């Protein structure tokens, strides 16, 4: 068994501005990535959640990293049911959208032909990483308002089919997916589609979280994501940096290491 450890993004603004990780001479995207790969063998690309990724960037990432380095890539926010401002879409897609006064769009607000284009472009953008053997899992994070209903299950399975044959991971943010009624059916769905079940560590006594369920649903991979245990900022209106601002202690890490090894 191989265990890879990495961070969610190597270009996070707060990480760079903290001056706690990168040395002073790492002041370009290339330098930061090359330095990062000397510390960690894995990274999660989160820029692909906020905007569509590009093949040119993927090619540069593949070129600037050593053999065996792995990129997990977050799925674009529109695909996972998140609200998406039109400006987050490519300009040609924006131009072809139906006229609307909505500030935010959701998946079903976008015409099917345009969705086809977005899916195709998303996976084409990952091709340089796949071809280089450096693409890990494509991570779909479903927000807490995507609950375990037949409609949501249909969309989740739709995402699984669209991502095939790439290795795909699902992270659910609403507890209904793993409550007594739906836990087994959710895990069975993941197994049937070869989906990697994402195990989440987060504050224990807060809303809008799924409690850790230590299950492996894919023979290829298991993912554990550490969100931190900062209960005070978890449900607040602050930034993501504030929400996830947490340093795990040695005892907490050892507590997590045991089930990971198992």
Task: List the predicted regions and their residue ranges.
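Residues lining hydrophobic/aromatic ligand-binding pockets adjacent to catalytic sites
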Residues: 1-262
């Amino acid at each position: 068994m191989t265990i890879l450890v990495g961070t969610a993004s190597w270009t996070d603004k707060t990480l760079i501005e903290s001056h706690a990780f990168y040395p002073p001479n790492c002041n370009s995207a290339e330098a930061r990535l090359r330095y990062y790969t000397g510390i960690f063998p894995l990274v999660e690309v989160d820029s692909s959640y906020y905007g569509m990724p590009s093949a040119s960037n993927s090619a540069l990432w593949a070129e600037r990293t050593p053999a065996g380095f792995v990129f997990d890539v977050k799925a674009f926010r529109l695909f996972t049911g998140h609200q998406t401002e039109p400006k987050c879409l490519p300009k040609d897609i924006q131009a072809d959208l139906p006229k609307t006064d909505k500030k935010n769009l959701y998946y079903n607000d976008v015409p099917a032909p345009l969705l086809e284009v977005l899916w195709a472009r998303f996976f084409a953008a990952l091709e340089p990483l796949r071809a280089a053997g450096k693409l890990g899992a494509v991570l779909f994070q479903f927000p807490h308002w995507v609950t375990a209903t037949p409609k949501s299950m249909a969309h989740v399975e739709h995402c699984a089919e669209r991502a095939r044959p790439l290795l795909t991971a699902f992270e659910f943010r609403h507890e209904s997916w793993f409550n007594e009624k739906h836990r087994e059916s959710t895990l069975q769905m993941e197994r049937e589609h070869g989906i990697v079940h994402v195990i989440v560590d987060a504050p224990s006594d807060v809303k809008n979280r799924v409690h850790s369920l230590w299950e492996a649903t894919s023979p290829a991979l298991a993912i554990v994501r550490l969100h931190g245990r900062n209960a005070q900022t978890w449900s607040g209106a602050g930034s993501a940096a504030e929400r996830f601002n947490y340093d795990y202690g040695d005892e907490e890490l050892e507590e997590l290491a045991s089930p990971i090894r198992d």
